[in-house]
Amino acid sequence: MSLEPSEHIALRAEVSELERLNRWVERLCEYHELPERVALQLDICLTEVVTNIISYAYPETTRSMSAVAVRFALRRPEVAVEIEDHGVPFDPLAYIPAQPASTLEDSQVGGHGLRLVRKFAGEMRYRRDGSFNRLRLTFALPRH
């Protein structure tokens, strides 16, 4: 399942790295002239997944020494990204998010990010490879 990337970025597992991730995604989307919709979905999904890794994959005491790798590959008619970390095992495909609340008063903050990722990504694949979590997301590109 390993992705042969055309681009990659290594991030420290720190919230401050999200800005660098967002700039990287923006640069790639502009360079490859990806449609605005795909660029927005890609940015939202990567921000959500990497935020979850930063928040939950590593103990707080070792977080600043931990890393997250993101690989990007454009393979028309799709874009693929692979997110890799060596945190605690977590299969987002097995995670069942809570149903959205029916009223604003009943709603809770958090827990909706993976729902967005599932909605926006055309395909999600996860595997645990030794001590690594690997999540691949694909996004369909419109036909010209």
Enumerate the predicted regions with their spans.
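Flexible, glycine-/charge-rich segments associated with ATP-binding catalytic modules
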Residues: 1-9, 118-144
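Helix-loop-beta hinge of the Bergerat
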Residues: 4-37
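Solvent-exposed beta-strand sheet faces enriched in polar/charged residues
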Residues: 12, 71-73, 82-84, 127, ...
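Conserved short strand/loop->alpha-helix "switch" segment adjacent to the catalytic nucleotide/phosphoryl-transfer site
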Residues: 26-47, 106-108
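Conserved polar catalytic motif of the HATPase_c/GHKL fold
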Residues: 48, 52
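ATP-lid-like helix-loop hinge signature
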Residues: 53-74, 82
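Glycine-rich/acidic phosphate-handling loop/turn and adjacent ATP-lid/helix
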Residues: 79-109
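Glycine-rich phosphate-binding loop
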Residues: 105-121
